[in-house]
Amino acid sequence: MAASLWMGDLEPYMDENFISRAFATMGETVMSVKIIRNRLTGIPAGYCFVEFADLATAEKCLHKINGKPLPGATPAKRFKLNYATYGKQPDNSPEYSLFVGDLTPDVDDGMLYEFFVKVYPSCRGGKVVLDQTGVSKGYGFVKFTDELEQKRALTECQGAIGLGSKPVRLSVAIPKASRVKPVEYSQMYSYSYNQYYQQYQNYYAQWGYDQNTGSYSYSYPQYGYTQSTMQTYEEVGDDALEDPMPQLDVTEANKEFMEQSEELYDALMDCHWQPLDTVSSEIPAMM
């Protein structure tokens, strides 16, 4: 049975042939591509639906190439893919996620997903967080639909090797307090990892968090609506992602503390009168 993926963030010049070639370049074969256009103006709405032979192929493609550079795109863009629901109600089954830290730059979404799904079948996706230039920030998230498997993964994979070149560091990703929003359309699918935060602070905080690619929520109506109506992005900054176990260089911290203390001491001493040369020296007049 054929299955489709939603593909967004398209430029006007990206037609069916361009999309098909882009997938072919990544080693994926698509059955068809449907570019959605505004019903009144005929202008492309900025998204399309890509059909695959079956659901397994579509899922494999989603995990393999989502977030990777889009071949031939000018300016440079990345694949922005999601499941297409075609009128089905959103999947409201509970999700249990893990924060995955200490990821090396070579780890992508597909590798993260495959590392967990081969042992924990309820794993539903993996997301490596990227900066604005597309470089990994060194951490990501994985989702599970089975809480027991999430807990097993947390225990069994803590410090595991085989995902990149460093042992992985895991902690529970805690969902933020949910914000109630009206559902305007029945055709909606949420695929956001920005709803999670960590219970400790300053995970790579020096880089800042302005993540705009590969992590989003959207809703799309029936064909013919404009892109602004079709797609609503969650404005949730990545500054909410925090470090479960920050590294502290004790030696460096002590050095900085001593330097600051010496500066304070010198400043205090400079506020006093200068010492007299001898006991018989004349005391300077007050200014």
Swiss-Prot record:
Residues 3-86, 96-175 form the RRM domain. Keywords: Cytoplasm, Nucleus, Protein biosynthesis, Repeat, RNA-binding. Its main location: nucleus. It is found in: Nucleus; Cytoplasm. Pfam families: RRM_1, Trnau1ap. GO terms for cellular component: cytoplasm; nucleus. Gene3D superfamilies: 3.30.70.330. One of its GO terms (molecular function) is tRNA binding. GO terms for biological process: selenocysteine incorporation. It comes from the Eukaryota. The keyword Nucleus applies. Involved in the early steps of selenocysteine biosynthesis and tRNA(Sec) charging to the later steps resulting in the cotranslational incorporation of selenocysteine into selenoproteins. Stabilizes the SECISBP2, EEFSEC and tRNA(Sec) complex. May be involved in the methylation of tRNA(Sec). Enhances efficiency of selenoproteins synthesis. Belongs to the RRM TRSPAP family. Component of the tRNA(Sec) complex composed at least of EEFSEC, SECISBP2, SEPHS1, SEPSECS, TRNAU1AP and tRNA(Sec). Found in a complex with tRNA(Sec). Interacts with SEPSECS. Associates with mRNP and/or polysomes. Found in a complex with EEFSEC, SECISBP2, TRNAU1AP and tRNA(Sec). This is tRNA selenocysteine 1-associated protein 1. The gene is TRNAU1AP.
